[in-house]
Structures are given as structure tokens and as C-alpha cells.
């Protein structure tokens, strides 16, 4: 459950380490984002020489949340951290690698490139 001012770890190799959510996309009064939802964020921490810099405003898709999510079969999925992958405007990832597992909800929301790059889909 990600909302404005939430800080997320970046799970790709764009060079950003941490981002801060500034808007949840998908409706004028949408408050929370879960796995597979797109957010607008600003880069708070980045490594030197990266293709994204501190202060850049980026779009990202949430891939892991600490808040559990109930699935259609009755099971729950939750992770140890909140993480996101920085994406381009056409919903393709800006990086070339994804670190850590991602939720199965990304496949249902048509983020196929992220699912194929991820080492594990839970």
C-alpha cells in the first residue's frame, strides 16, 4: 500500500537507489497503490554517473509491497520491502535488469517485459 510521500527501493539497474512517491496514477482521488500500479515519483538517492539523477521525476510501477494483498484464490502475498521499477512512457522498463522477485499481478496488468526480466515471479 503505497501513498504520497512513501519511499520505495528501486529494483532495477537504472542507477536510482530510492524514490519518493509524489502521485498515484489512475483517478483523481486515488489514494493507494499496490503491486502493478503506476506511480509518479522523484529520485531521492542515485549512484554517480547513472542515467537517472537525484531530483528527476520518473514514472514507476510497484513490484513489491509490505502490505499483504489478497489474491482471487484466497492466498495472500507480501514482501519484506516496498520496491518499484522505473518505466518509460510506453510501460517498458528503463533499466535492463530487475533485482529480486516481483508479484504475479504484473502479468495480469500487462507488464510482460518486467516479468520476463525478473529472476522470480511470486
From Swiss-Prot:
Family, per entry: Belongs to the universal ribosomal protein uL14 family.
GO cellular component labels: cytosolic large ribosomal subunit
One GO biological process term: translation
Keyword RNA-binding included in the entry's annotation: yes
Domain of life: Bacteria
NCBIfam families: rplN_bact
Phylogenetic placement of the source organism: Bacteria, Bacillati, Actinomycetota, Actinomycetes, Mycobacteriales
The protein's assembly and partners: Part of the 50S ribosomal subunit. Forms a cluster with proteins L3 and L19. In the 70S ribosome, L14 and L19 interact and together make contacts with the 16S rRNA in bridges B5 and B8.
Organism, as annotated: Mycobacterium sp. (strain KMS)
Protein name listed in UniProt: Large ribosomal subunit protein uL14
GO molecular function: large ribosomal subunit rRNA binding; structural constituent of ribosome
Amino acid at each position: 500500500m503505497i501513498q504520497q510521500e512513501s519511499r520505495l527501493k528501486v529494483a532495477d539497474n537504472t542507477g536510482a537507489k530510492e524514490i519518493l512517491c509524489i502521485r498515484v496514477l489512475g483517478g483523481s482521488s486515488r489514494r493507494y497503490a499496490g503491486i502493478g500500479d503506476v506511480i509518479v515519483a522523484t529520485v531521492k538517492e542515485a549512484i554517480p554517473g547513472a542515467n537517472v539523477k537525484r531530483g528527476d521525476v520518473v514514472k514507476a510501477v510497484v513490484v513489491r509491497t509490505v502490505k499483504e494483498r489478497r489474491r482471487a484464490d484466497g492466498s495472500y502475498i507480501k514482501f519484506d520491502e516496498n520496491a518499484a521499477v522505473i518505466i518509460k512512457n510506453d510501460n517498458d522498463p528503463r533499466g535492463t535488469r530487475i533485482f529480486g522477485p516481483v508479484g504475479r499481478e504484473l502479468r495480469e496488468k500487462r507488464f510482460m517485459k518486467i516479468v520476463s526480466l525478473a529472476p522470480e515471479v511470486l
